[in-house]
Amino acid sequence: MTKRTSAKYKIDRRMGENIWGRPKSPVNRREYGPGQHGQRRKGKMSDFGLQLRAKQKLKGYYGDLTEKQFRRIYGEAERVKGDTGENLIGLLERRLDAVVYRAKFVPTVFAARQFVNHGHVLVNGKRVNIPSYRVKEGDVIEVRERSKQLASVLEAVSLAERDVPDYLEVDHSKMTATFVRTPHLGDVPYAVVMEPNLVVEYYAKN
């Protein structure tokens, strides 16, 4: 098992949920957490526990972001007009690695980060190797010509369990994606329930 594969399954086990909806997730086979005490019945979670869990789930979903990275994004969401939770989702979905994952250019968000880091992605015709790069409406994201036949790309395109959301216009024959608009929470095809409102509550108290 690769380090990236291990990381994503570790997050699933930690959360006790198959947060990316992957068929091979270990939580599909059991309903308890990792470790020797994982089978003990869980008590009712406190409000703080629910808020912390919501934050950890979102951080994990986008590639196990560090607290510093996530807190910075949250701070931006807080400063923008509108609902902070919705703003947070919009900013996370505008990350280049998130767009590469959503477009089904790679099979996992971890692979998306590496894919961008290694220079396989162009934005408006220019190579961008920063996973946190923030795309704008109308930006065209594409896989470099020499990277289109990589095994990870071919695997991702064939994945039936993942749909491309309607805020992207994707042409897999050309391996291009246009970022049409910033999504709202209800637009994002999460495999599990995400609760950014609880993240807002968490940071309001901590």
Swiss-Prot record:
Protein name: Small ribosomal subunit protein uS4
Function: One of the primary rRNA binding proteins, it binds directly to 16S rRNA where it nucleates assembly of the body of the 30S subunit.
PANTHER family for this protein: 30S 40S RIBOSOMAL PROTEIN, SMALL RIBOSOMAL SUBUNIT PROTEIN US4M
CDD domains, per the entry: S4
Top-level taxon of origin: Bacteria
Taxonomic path: Bacteria, Pseudomonadati, Pseudomonadota, Alphaproteobacteria, Rhodobacterales
Residue span of region Disordered: 18-45
Oligomer status and interactors: Part of the 30S ribosomal subunit. Contacts protein S5. The interaction surface between S4 and S5 is involved in control of translational fidelity.
Annotated source species: Ruegeria pomeroyi (strain ATCC 700808 / DSM 15171 / DSS-3) (Silicibacter pomeroyi)
All copies of domain S4 RNA-binding, residue ranges: 94-157
One of the GO biological process terms: translation
Recorded GO CC terms: small ribosomal subunit
Gene3D superfamilies assigned to the protein according to its UniProt record, in alphabetical order: Ribosomal Protein S4 Delta 41, Chain A, domain 1 (1.10.1050.10), RNA-binding S4 domain (3.10.290.10)
HAMAP family: Ribosomal_uS4_B
A Pfam family annotated for this UniProt entry: S4
GO molecular function (one): structural constituent of ribosome
UniProt KW Nucleus keyword: no
Similarity annotation: Belongs to the universal ribosomal protein uS4 family.
